[in-house]
Amino acid sequence: MKSVITTTISAADAAGRFPSSSDLESVQGNIQRAAARLEAAEKLASNHEAVVKEAGDACFAKYSYLKNPGEAGDSQEKVNKCYRDVDHYMRLVNYCLVVGGTGPVDEWGIAGAREVYRTLNLPTSAYVASFAFARDRLCVPRDMSAQAGVEYAGNLDYLINALS
């Protein structure tokens, strides 16, 4: 799984060298942010049901046409699948926070996602709206510390950009 540490080691190994001072500084910075990432992961895990529901609700409020006949959310079963997908991606964001890298999203969330959604007539813009809402509803210090919020928002930004 890709993280700052595994990426640094892989790059050094591929070049046949020891990690450089700047490589080690990058790893050290990643380790120093670990407490904030773990706080964000814990807060997300303990509130994930509300986060997923609010994000999904925001998506269907913004894209109400999705509930029209022939659209991605034209039955309760399809709506439930959309919420399931939002929950899946939020778990991947949580995993990214824990490992300190984008590996979980890259490996389990993005590879082929756009093609699958296009085939199933699921607009990625709706998912992007869900994750933007989840990012924007964050309130520091109500939800988490400022640094944890930076880590949380950064991972959601990565996901949003990857799906856009």
Curated annotation (Swiss-Prot):
Gene3D superfamilies: Phycocyanins (1.10.490.20). It is a peripheral membrane protein. Keywords: Antenna complex, Bile pigment, Chloroplast, Chromophore, Electron transport, Membrane, Photosynthesis, Phycobilisome, Plastid, Thylakoid, Transport. Heterodimer of an alpha and a beta chain. Contains two covalently linked bilin chromophores. Belongs to the phycobiliprotein family. It comes from Pyropia tenera. Light-harvesting photosynthetic bile pigment-protein from the phycobiliprotein complex. Its main location: plastid. This is R-phycoerythrin alpha chain. CDD domains: PE_alpha. (2R,3E)-phycoerythrobilin 2 binds at C139. InterPro entries: Globin-like_sf, Phycobilisome_asu/bsu, Phycobilisome_asu/bsu_sf. It is found in: Plastid, Chloroplast thylakoid membrane. GO terms for biological process: photosynthesis.
